[in-house]
Amino acid sequence: MKYQLDTREARVIGCMLEKQITTPDQYPMSLNGITTACNQKTNREPVMELSESEVQQTLDLLVKKHFLRTLSGFGNRVVKYEHRFCNSEFGDLKLSPAEVALVTTLLLRGPQTPGELRTRAARLYEFSDVSEAESTLEQLQQRDDGPFVVRLAREAGKRESRYRHLFSGDASDAAPEEEGAGDNSHQLTERVETLEKEVAELKRQLAALLA
């Protein structure tokens, strides 16, 4: 995939996507603002403690990759940064508001269930229910220019599967859950059909005995 980010780059992009929506008056962002956002104690998993020099190195790399651009001059006393990651006139990646909310939350907090994503992304986009979050995840998974998310194998004792973004790595660690589920469903259908035939035969035999 052309959109590949390391851990720090994913945190920076996630923070900029988030702040563009939640605090638009503070966007574009300065180095200090981005560093503070990256090291937030809330809404971040894992919590990081990046220095300004580490963040600056990451910003420089993202500028070279054309995922960010700098804004200076014209009254700006400090260099500001804005992302070109998605929905930019300079890039090809176009995401809906719902997709942006999910991608941002996955970048900032790692693998999560649809229910967790719906709750945690509420500041960015209000999903009507978990089903809308699930359908948006499916869209991200099935996009022609993607996939951008993958569903992971359900953990033991968990009701929901988690999803993770694919902007840092591929889907090789995802279990073929859908395939397994399809096999189980097929086996169950065959078993039901067999039982129905057995019941019908027993009814026929009973009717013959009572005749």
Swiss-Prot record:
Classification via Gene3D superfamilies: Winged helix-like DNA-binding domain superfamily/Winged helix DNA-binding domain
Pfam families: DUF480
SUPFAM superfamilies: Winged helix' DNA-binding domain
Span list, region Disordered: 168-188
Entry-linked InterPro entries: DUF480 (IPR007432), WH-like_DNA-bd_sf (IPR036388), WH_DNA-bd_sf (IPR036390)
Residue ranges crossing the lipid bilayer per the database entry: none
Similarity field: Belongs to the UPF0502 family.
HAMAP family per UniProt: UPF0502
Protein name: UPF0502 protein PC1_1804
